[in-house]
Amino acid sequence: MTGQSQFAGVWCPSITPMDNDGKIDLNGLNQHLKRLTEAKIDVILLMGSIGEFASFTLEERLLLIREARAMSSLKMVANVSSTCQNDVLLMAQEAYRSGYDAVMILPPYYYGQTAKQLLSYFRQLGQKLSGKWFAYNFPARTGCDLTPELVASLAAEFPNFAGIKDTVDCQSHTRSMIQTTRAVREDFAVLSGYDEYYIPNLLAGGAGIISGLNNVMPELFVSAREAF
């Protein structure tokens, strides 16, 4: 899977710099993304959990999407998660228009969802999204789990469903996600969301890591990638 996914490797979920007045610091973001680019990571994730996406207004998130894409030549993915599906689609449309390689989407958070509801939700999105997309599995924050079987079903149905960030503190869960999705899609990227699971992810045939630590020391994970 690792060799066949265009999104394999070391990802950084970028921080979102703010000024002393609590406004987005675009110059600071530009400098930060420049450093990540020079460190030769593979993919930048904009507005992930560590990027504090839930703290911003829709207008601020659209501004970030529009402005950040030109700050790096690396592959970039925008997290467009929201409890409002129309906002998800609006941000996704802006991301595709701005040149992002994909978008990432959490299940509706706050409302705990059943497997049937999750399948329906992502099917609706899959039918409306015009580009590649990732699911973001973070049960500790959403109150629901995207199971390997559910994800494999969606991967088989939607070619533009490019992969998943599996932020579950259980390596066997991610291993099962890798094995189950691989049975239906060799190009499907399963990425771990915990720093310490990078090498176990690769050993299991996964696509890599989305590590917040890369904001501070991206060279560490790049060197691990090169050594593997």
Regions found by a protein language model. Give the residues of each.
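Active-site beta->alpha loop and helix N-cap motifs at the rims of alpha/beta catalytic domains
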Residues: 2-145
